[in-house]
């Protein structure tokens, strides 16, 4: 099934305007909520969508709850796991068990095994790219996985895999949830509509899983909603090139910005313009306008905002203005810098000023 790509730059209402609007439209066309599947990449986003859907007038009196809606509005991992035989998620206690079995699991002392521990991050990134451990080693930034080598990773991975599969453990990780869903024995879901929120963050196995989910949708109701310019996870397998090409000829484009001032809009457009030129995928993306909720400005007037260059983080007129805004207003701002070690200096600067 060919997807309908919805291009939505920052703050254009991808979630609360397009997705909720589509949900209401499908309900009016007599599509059953049980067969409308909306998936995102984080529990926070999925929960926000669930809560918003349950507040729709069209959903009142139908008996749905946050718990029951989890079957159709959730993360990609959770949806895949829900269609498989029960397994427990591999966690920190399991990691500690592996350390007892093999000390090299503790070569990286990091306890955040889902995001920071070098061994688990490597196998997650390799699988996210659809590569074997050896294939990924040839293309990755090896320094980011030190002190592990590919030979050590392969040895530990065998121990890790055997541990998960042992009948007394029966564990899985996030990648397993998606890969197990892709097994031919798992039937294609019987759903009428599929919406993927922030689709640009999908890695290789997730993309294959999404395609499997879309096999039985009705009347072309297969939507990828996202922003190619916000493809942040290429390091873990997302495909920016694919989404920039989709953005060059989208099914629909969300044009009205509701978050960024004109100053921020221009700053971001200048940064991303060369990419748009390369793909021929320019966005309209207008600056935000004042509305009644702002309690200032004229309703419908473009929010101008301001842009300030800071020569340093010690003393300048613009720095005084910035600090005043941070401490004495509720205004939001975009603060940009260039790489390391600027990130450390900026973080310490903000900590210093509360």
Question: What function would you assign to each model-found segment?
Answer:
Residues 54-58, 89-90, 211-214, 239-243, ...:
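Glycine-rich, phosphate-binding/catalytic loops in enzymes
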Residues 1-89:
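P-loop NTPase Walker
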Residues 9-15, 20, 41-44, 200-300, ...:
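Conserved helicase motor core of SF1/SF2 NTP-dependent helicases
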Residues 311-331:
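Conserved interdomain hinge at the start of the Helicase C-terminal
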Residues 3-5, 35-37, 192-193, 221, ...:
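Residue-level preference for the first positions of well-ordered beta-strands
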Residues 1-9, 16-17, 35, 109-195, ...:
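Accessory N-terminal region flanking or inserted into the helicase ATPase core
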Residues 88-167, 251-255, 259-291, 306:
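Interdomain motor-coupling "hinge/lid" segment immediately C-terminal to the ATP-binding subdomain
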Residues 84-86, 345-350:
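Short active-site loop/helix that positions an aromatic residue
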């Amino acid at each position: 099934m060919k997807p309908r790509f919805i291009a939505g730059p920052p703050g254009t209402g991808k979630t609360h305007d397009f997705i909720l609007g589509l949900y209401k439209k499908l309900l009016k066309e007599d599509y059953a909520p049980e067969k409308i599947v909306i998936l995102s990449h984080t529990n926070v986003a999925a929960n926000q969508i669930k809560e918003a859907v349950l507040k729709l007038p069209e959903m009142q009196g139908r008996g749905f709850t946050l718990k029951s809606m989890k079957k159709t509005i959730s993360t990609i991992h959770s949806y895949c796991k829900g269609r498989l035989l029960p397994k427990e998620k591999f966690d920190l206690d399991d990691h500690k068990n592996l350390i007892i079995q093999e000390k090299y699991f503790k070569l990286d002392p990091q306890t955040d095994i889902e995001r920071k521990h070098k061994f688990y991050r490597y196998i997650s990134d390799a699988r996210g790219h659809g590569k074997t451990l050896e294939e990924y080693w040839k293309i990755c930034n090896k320094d980011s996985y030190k002190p592990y080598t590919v030979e050590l990773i392969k040895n530990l991975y065998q121990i890790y895999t055997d541990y998960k599969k042992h009948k007394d453990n029966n564990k899985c990780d996030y990648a397993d949830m998606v890969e197990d869903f892709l097994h031919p024995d798992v039937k294609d879901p019987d759903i009428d509509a599929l919406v993927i929120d922030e689709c640009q963050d999908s890695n290789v196995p997730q993309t294959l899983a999404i395609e499997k989910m879309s096999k039985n949708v009705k009347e072309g109701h297969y939507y990828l909603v996202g922003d190619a310019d916000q493809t942040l996870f290429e390091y873990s397998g997302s495909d920016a090139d694919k989404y920039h090409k989709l953005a060059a000829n989208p099914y629909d484009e969300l044009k009205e910005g509701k978050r960024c001032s004109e100053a921020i809009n221009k700053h971001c457009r200048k940064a991303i313009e060369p990419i748009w030129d390369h793909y021929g995928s320019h966005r309209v993306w207008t600056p935000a306008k004042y509305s009644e909720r702002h309690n200032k400005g004229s309703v419908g007037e473009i929010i101008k905002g301001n842009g300030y260059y800071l020569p340093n983080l010690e003393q300048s007129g613009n720095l005084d203005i910035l600090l005043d805004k941070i401490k004495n207003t509720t205004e939001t701002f975009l603060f940009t810098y260039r790489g390391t070690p600027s990130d450390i200096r900026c973080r310490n600067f903000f900590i210093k000023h509360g």
